[in-house]
A protein has these predicted regions:
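Conserved active-site and SAM-binding loop architecture
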Residues: 1-174
Length: 174
């Protein structure tokens, strides 16, 4: 990460401390016998814990919360039967992404996507529904770390529903 050197200058042990918190999460999950996961953005955690079991972007769960329409690849390490949720993307988000991929061959930052689609029938769709980069563009502030570390609500709901089969059975019975 581009911030590692400044973090390391402030605290040479910052990465070890983060790994310790992740290991504590893993141990509590194992001791409790429940599904568990810890997350971290793409980082050096893979050199400590191995490759992530699952990765996602918040926009992939906009079917459960449209406020999460942004990019931020996040890695999960999981255990004890954790079930990764199925993607649940809002149809308009999916259509906007498809339009950009059709025109450009791949996803790209929203500003570039809007420029590339400008003047086409998809311009409004992409402007309104294409995932933004708010996390990466978040200016330095006292709240930046909290904004970047907040769990996306749509993903949190999807994880809960995937890992609470007893509640799904109650819902089906109702």
């Amino acid at each position: 990460s581009r911030w590692f050197e400044s973090k390391r200058a402030k605290d040479p042990h910052f990465q070890a401390k983060a790994a310790l918190v992740a290991e504590q999460c893993r141990m509590v999950g194992l001791a409790a016998g429940c599904p568990w996961a810890f997350e971290n953005p793409v980082s050096v955690f893979s050199s400590i814990f191995g490759s992530a079991d699952y990765t996602f972007h918040p926009y992939q769960f906009t079917g459960l919360c449209t406020d999460d329409n942004y990019t931020k690849q996040t890695c999960l390490w999981t255990g004890n039967g954790f079930k990764a949720p199925a993607e649940n993307m809002h149809p308009m988000v999916e259509a906007a992404i498809d339009a950009v991929k059709l025109a450009c061959g791949r996803m790209m930052p929203k500003k570039k996507a809007i420029e590339a689609i400008s003047g086409t029938s998809f311009a409004g769709l992409v402007t309104d529904w294409y995932p933004d980069n708010r996390i990466h563009e978040c200016p330095p502030s006292d709240e930046r770390a909290n904004i970047r570390s907040a769990t996306p609500l749509g993903f949190a709901k999807a994880v809960f529903l995937s890992n609470a089969p007893h509640l799904n059975k109650k819902r089906e019975a109702a």
